[in-house]
């Protein structure tokens, strides 16, 4: 099994993250910046994140309008920055891979 890694996230409704806020622009700019610096990408936008389905996340899932979306990162400072920029989001963290979260980036969304 892979070594456990801590992941940080912001969580909001898909509508808020993907339509109301210009988050795609922020992520595109950050991706470009990472490529210029030859840094490995450490953030991902996930529609309907599967980690919300585990029992320990039930209360958090209830607080978030569905369908949800998350930006997950191994960089806590990036998530803190996003939280300050976006305001109306839920933040948290988890460790994976684990028995309950085998794939931290898994989505329940089917690609159409």
PLM regions and their residue ranges:
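Short acidic, S/G/P-rich loop/turn micro-motifs used as interaction or catalytic elements
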Residues: 13-22, 50-54, 77-79, 102
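Eukaryote-biased feature marking scaffold/signaling PDZ-domain proteins and nuclear chromatin regulators
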Residues: 38-41, 66
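N-terminal chloroplast transit peptides
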Residues: 1-4
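Solvent-exposed, low-complexity segments and loops of surface/extracellular structural proteins
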Residues: 9-10
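Polybasic, proline/glycine-rich intrinsically disordered low-complexity segments
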Residues: 54-112
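Eukaryotic intrinsically disordered and solvent-exposed regulatory patches
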Residues: 28-33, 56-58
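Well-ordered, non-membrane alpha-helical segments in soluble/globular domains
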Residues: 19-31
């Amino acid at each position: 099994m892979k070594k456990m890694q801590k992941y940080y996230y912001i969580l909001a409704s898909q509508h808020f993250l993907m339509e109301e806020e210009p988050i795609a622009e922020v992520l595109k700019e950050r991706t470009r910046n990472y490529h210029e610096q030859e840094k490995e990408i450490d953030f991902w936008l996930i529609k309907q994140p599967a980690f919300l389905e585990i029992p320990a996340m039930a209360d958090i899932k209830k607080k978030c309008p569905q369908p949800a979306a998350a930006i997950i990162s191994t960089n806590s400072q990036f998530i803190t920055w996003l939280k300050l920029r976006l305001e109306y989001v839920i933040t948290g963290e988890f460790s994976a891979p684990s028995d309950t979260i085998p794939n931290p980036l898994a989505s329940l969304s089917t690609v159409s």
